[in-house]
Regions:
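Glycine-rich oxoanion-binding loops at beta->alpha junctions
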Residues: 58-76, 123, 127-128
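Structural motif
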Residues: 23, 56, 65, 80-82, ...
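Short, ordered loop/turn segments at secondary-structure junctions
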Residues: 29, 87-88, 122-127
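Extreme N-terminal tail/first-helix region
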Residues: 1-16
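Short helix-capping segments at alpha-helix termini
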Residues: 46-51, 78, 113-114
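Glycine-rich phosphate/diphosphate-binding loop of Rossmann-like nucleotide-binding domains
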Residues: 12-60
């Protein structure tokens, strides 16, 4: 599992984001992790030229609701891309598998249906510590 250099990118290879409008849909579940991820996404967008006024952020209860939140954002806001941010941690039941599969397939479906890219930023780790390390 990668836990180092996760935030490295070559800024010279990224187009300037000044003229783009971004949406971020964040799961409220495991907020100590998803808040870090959202902050990192916003900081990165702004580092690439996006203005805070052009970044819309919505919250949904959990990762399973990310798909619905992204769909509604695409349909109601004029955005160029949306980032789905969530966290699912393995437990003792199959719930983890169902949530991960549903969210993944839902985001794939949104990317097929709409001309607005939906970026998958959902950590699916075995432990909370792994998620904290990666966030």
């Amino acid at each position: 599992m990668a836990t180092t250099n996760l935030s490295y990118y070559d800024k010279a290879t990224i187009p300037n984001a000044k003229s783009f409008r971004f949406g971020i849909v964040v799961s409220e579940w495991n907020p100590e992790i998803t808040t870090n991820l959202a902050k990192g996404a916003i900081d990165t967008l702004m580092d690439c030229g996006a203005s805070i006024e052009n970044i819309i952020s919505w919250e949904v209860p959990g990762s399973f609701e990310l798909v619905y939140g992204c769909k509604k954002m695409i349909e109601s806001q004029k955005i160029d891309a949306v980032i789905a941010i969530g966290n699912v941690i393995q437990g003792e039941t199959k719930h983890f598998d169902f949530v991960c599969k549903g969210v993944t397939q839902g985001i794939v479906d949104l990317n097929i249906k709409y001309d607005v890219p939906v970026i998958f930023c959902v950590l699916t780790d075995n432990t909370k510590q792994q998620s904290l390390d990666r966030s």
